[in-house]
Amino acid sequence: MATFKKFNKDKRPKRNTQSLLFKRKRFCRFTVAGVEEIDYKDVDTLRDFIAENGKIIPARLTGTRAIYQRQLNTAIKRARFLALLPYSDQHKI
């Protein structure tokens, strides 16, 4: 039967604690700008919330409030349907 070594916590590599402590506070760009409704025709703004592979970036990463995230999802999907934005990264923007 195989024997297992006990893991020694002292030999683990140390993490850089400064990079873990300093995280930029996320804020909602639409709240700051006073936007009431996100427009699907504003392609430049919508591109900021789409990843390189074409996926919509979640609110926990962008800091967007829930009401604006729902509007953003709808606007991106409309822009994709009207061929203003690509569905995937295989297409040129």
From Swiss-Prot:
Task: Give UniProt keywords alphabetically.
Answer: Ribonucleoprotein, Ribosomal protein, RNA-binding, rRNA-binding
One GO MF term, please?
Answer: small ribosomal subunit rRNA binding
Organism of origin is Acidovorax ebreus (strain TPSY) (Diaphorobacter sp. (strain TPSY))
Any one GO biological process: translation
Task: Name a GO CC annotation attached to this entry.
Answer: cytosolic small ribosomal subunit
Protein name, as recorded:
Small ribosomal subunit protein bS18
The yes or no answer to whether the keyword Ribosomal protein is present is yes
How would you summarize the oligomeric state and partners of this protein?
A: Part of the 30S ribosomal subunit. Forms a tight heterodimer with protein bS6.
Mind telling me which InterPro entries this protein's record contains?
Answer: Ribosomal_bS18 (IPR001648), Ribosomal_bS18_sf (IPR036870)
Key word Transcription regulation present in the record?
A: no
Q: What does the similarity note say?
A: Belongs to the bacterial ribosomal protein bS18 family.
What this protein is reported to do is described as: Binds as a heterodimer with protein bS6 to the central domain of the 16S rRNA, where it helps stabilize the platform of the 30S subunit.
